[in-house]
Amino acid sequence: SPEAPHALISGTTGSGKTALARGMIASLAAHNSPADLGLLLIDPKGRGYAPFASLPHLLAPVAQSPQEALALLDWLVGEMERRDHEGTTLPRIITFIDELADLALVGGATVTAALTRLSQRGREAGLHLVCCTQKPSAAIIGSLVKANFPARLVGSVASAEDARVAAGIARSGAERLAGRGDFLLVVQGTTHRFQAAYCTEAELALHLGEGETPLPLATALCPSG
């Protein structure tokens, strides 16, 4: 929505954050054609988004290495600038990042700067970010997410301080959540508790079917002709 163009999903191991992100990807793919919606996936561990490797909505293969992630983010910044110049917003492109804190640590200032630009200006260009992290540390991601991710989906976290950074508000109680898909949605000053859906890889394959393998990253993002 215009009020929540980007989302941050936080939670420790076992909170269900990867399952929640998978459910979001599956739902978006099921309800939007590849002509209307493009997806970009950054998955440093190579496991979270593996079931979507052949999804027809993918604009490029799932990025795993820091170099692939940076190339993808660089392309997105260029696409944002192109759309700003031309006044276009379609098709919508949603980028899912499986571990924001790790990417910020490994990629350093270059990655942080690209993500900051995209989170600040991407909405007007039809570009959106959904970032997951199990390390909602203020020292690592605090400045990046503080004002730029208005929708927070918070699973069980390790401490009240992590809950504050993840939710963007004090005393959310996220450190007392049960895990396994027990989440808080914090948006526009309101908090809602919900249970995230869980889909096995077999169920995802059954419902999404098999698409063509995306083109290699360089070809997909920089096509010739």
Residue ranges of predicted features:
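C-terminal regions of RecA-like/P-loop NTPase motor modules
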Residues: E210-G225
